Amino acid sequence: MRFLKINMKKFLPILLLVFVLSPTFLFVVDETQQAIITELGEYKRTISKPGLSFKKPFIEKVTKFDNRILSTDAPPGEYLTLDKKRLVVDFIARWKIVDPLVFFKSVNNLFSANSRIEDIVFSEMREELATHNINEVIAENRELIMDEVKIGSTERLKDFGMELIDVRIKRADLPSEVQRSVFDRMIAERSRISKRYR
């Protein structure tokens, strides 16, 4: 029993030291994450399986990325249709990081990724909406238009280690000044009709 007490006194500081230093050489990759390891800024390896992993203390750096489906909710943008009508459209894009190394080297973080997605999808949508009239955009061919936007955007996002899963128009409205004139015209027409019945 005395031998056990002496050995515990010797090993307790060692155990405490290992416990304190363990974050420098151990890290956990969650099941919703993937990670890349860099050594002094140079890529070493990718970890895509969840669990406990090791790294060289103080030399290797771990950068974790989400491997779930993420979404980008873009602010409204103004587009011109084939029949020269202006539309205010906002969209939502669902995407995923498929190559963490390319993602890390090209955009590095979610804020930059969201900006890049907004720019690319906005550009593709501007090109696609310019080939359709306002009725097709609002009612008739919205699915077809969004499929074309997705195809064009997906190809461009591969260069950033991202895969576009879906793009949807949340809202498509006329600009506020046009809405006001439409409402004024509707009110004038209704009052003209009501005067006929008096």
Question: What does each model-found stretch correspond to?
Answer:
Residues 20, 67-82, 103, 147-152:
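N-terminal post-signal-peptidase region of extra-cytosolic proteins
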Residues 26, 43-45, 79, 100-103, ...:
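Short beta-strands and strand-coil junctions in structured, solvent-facing domains, enriched
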Residues 102-106, 114:
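Solvent-exposed, non-transmembrane alpha-helical starts
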